[in-house]
Amino acid sequence: MEAERLNAIAQQLDDLRARGRELRRYLDYDEKSSKLEEVTRALEDPAVWNNAEKAQELGKEKRQLEDVVHNLRDIESLSSDLKDLFDLAEAEDDEDTLAAVEADIGELQAKVHALEFRRMFSNPMDPNPCFIEIQAGAGGTEAQDWAGMLERMYLRYCERKGFNVELMEESEGEVAGIKGATIKVSGDYAYGFLRTETGIHRLVRKSPFDSNARRHTSFSSVFVYPEVDDSIQIDINPADLRIDTYRASGAGGQHINKTDSAVRITHEPTGVVVQCQNDRSQHKNKAEAMSMLKARLYELELRKRQSEQQKLEDSKSDIGWGHQIRSYVLDQSRIKDLRTNFEVGNTQAVLDGDLDDFIAASLKQGV
């Protein structure tokens, strides 16, 4: 076996073990491990199920603790096993064992990288589910088609990440695409992964809707906000609400268009508007819309506390059309994030949901 190859593998293993130790320190492994035992014991007590809300909170906390503790244990165990195998391969000059070690290093690197990525989730709401609102800008069919492309991009991204998605409401475009849509995303750190997508997305392309194939520029806004659980108190005065019902405009079969099951709620003091049409039951749609409103009002208050430069005035204009975050220039095969200057040339991959590098760059820079 070549000494250079052995040294490279040994260095990789030492580096990964050191990163694993740093993660245990940074993520408070000992404290989280003790807390996991405590929560597990609490859930084993039959009396806890007398309070369904408390049991649900404990179950959620247990899953979050297990995610960290079990992954840290896996990293330590795999690191130790690979070190032992490497020492054996080196001592016995065993090429097959050494090749197996090299193959498994990739798995260890992926586990370490995934936990290191978590260190960038600094927002206390990052572990929560979230909502993605997409709104077409001015420009008619071209802008609406672009909004539809963004909706598809985020659905594909969520599929890649293993997130669960639910289309809360969708307004179809007049010719193609959509005028707007709201998607609920559930999964570990859904909000953390998606929150930096908030802003204006700009598309430049030769329009398929222009008979002269001229270059068109279109804009769509994306707004991501976290779902707020019941432990956070958001007081909503019923007198401040205007509740409208209407017939759903999106796809949903014959039944959905025969009844006024869709619900739109306007919070008069702030101008925040939410709507839901994903269920045939008006009652369920209203409950979901109230949950969305609570999340929006929480995000509004959070931004006020953080003294950000702009208040959220309503559900569509809260971002400001000048706040462009990413430019998609398709005929030049270039997509560039204007905040981080990260750029790629494979435009189709991005539109198919390959957003990891853009999201990682924005989280690293804290945008």
From Swiss-Prot:
Taxonomy, superkingdom: Bacteria
SMART domains: PCRF (SM00937)
Key words, A-Z: Cytoplasm, Methylation, Protein biosynthesis
PTM section of the record: Methylated by PrmC. Methylation increases the termination efficiency of RF2.
Database matches in Pfam families: PCRF (PF03462), RF-1 (PF00472)
UniProt keyword Protein biosynthesis, yes or no: yes
GO molecular function: translation release factor activity, codon specific
SUPFAM superfamilies for this protein: Release factor (SSF75620)
Protein biosynthesis among keywords: yes
GO CC, alphabetical: cytoplasm
PROSITE patterns, sorted: RF_PROK_I
The protein, known as: Peptide chain release factor 2
Organism annotation: Aromatoleum aromaticum (strain DSM 19018 / LMG 30748 / EbN1) (Azoarcus sp. (strain EbN1))
